[in-house]
Structures are given as structure tokens and as C-alpha cells.
Amino acid sequence: MVEEHRDVIYVTSNYVPGYRAVEVLGFVYGLTVRSRRLGGQIDRFKSILGGEIKEYVTMMEHSRQEALERMLDHARELGANAVISVRFDSDSISDIMQEILAYGTAVIVEPEE
């Protein structure tokens, strides 16, 4: 599936269907770090019982979107109009912080003829 954010196309595949890459500009990424403290004891209690922590899910969705937007801004700075091989990664920095990374390869694409 091809997505477009303002003027930059992004895909998880190694190419954009219907386009050809005419220049590879390099690695781009967007990073955000968020605190996981969301009510302390209530969240611990929910996790013991196995329930979903909706506040945490919402925070992670917003973090993922922010990392994606930062990656696309990085691509724009390089002059790209597309990012291929887009991936996300997540890691805990400590007991209270979560890191979200969006990354891919910035390219210039043109429609195939």
C-alpha cells in the first residue's frame, strides 16, 4: 500500500509501484522518546489482570505518528519525494521511557512510462 504525507510518498516495500527510483539520497529517520508513567499503580494493576492499558496504546500511537512525521521531514530536507523500506522499531530506555524510531531510505522517484 502506498501512503503519502503531504508531498512525500512512503512505502514498506523496496520500491514504489508505478514509479522508478532515479536517485537514492540515503538513510532517514525520525525518533521520539516518551515517558511511560501513566498513573503508576492503576496501570500496574491492569497489567497484572491482563487488561489493555488504553492510555498507553494511545501514547504509543501518537509516538509512532510523531516518529513517522519526523522521518518524512528528514527526507524533505534531503530533497526526497519518497521513502522506501519504511520500518518502525521500539525499545525501552528505562523502566519509565519508551523510544520509537521510524526509518527508511530517501529516494527521488519518477512515474514509470
From Swiss-Prot:
Domain of life assignment: Archaea
One Pfam short name: YbjQ_1
Database matches in PANTHER family: UPF0145 PROTEIN SCO3412, UPF0145 PROTEIN YBJQ
Family, as annotated: Belongs to the UPF0145 family.
Protein name: UPF0145 protein MTH_544
Source species of the chain: Methanothermobacter thermautotrophicus (strain ATCC 29096 / DSM 1053 / JCM 10044 / NBRC 100330 / Delta H)
Phylogenetic lineage: Archaea, Methanobacteriati, Methanobacteriota, Methanomada group, Methanobacteria
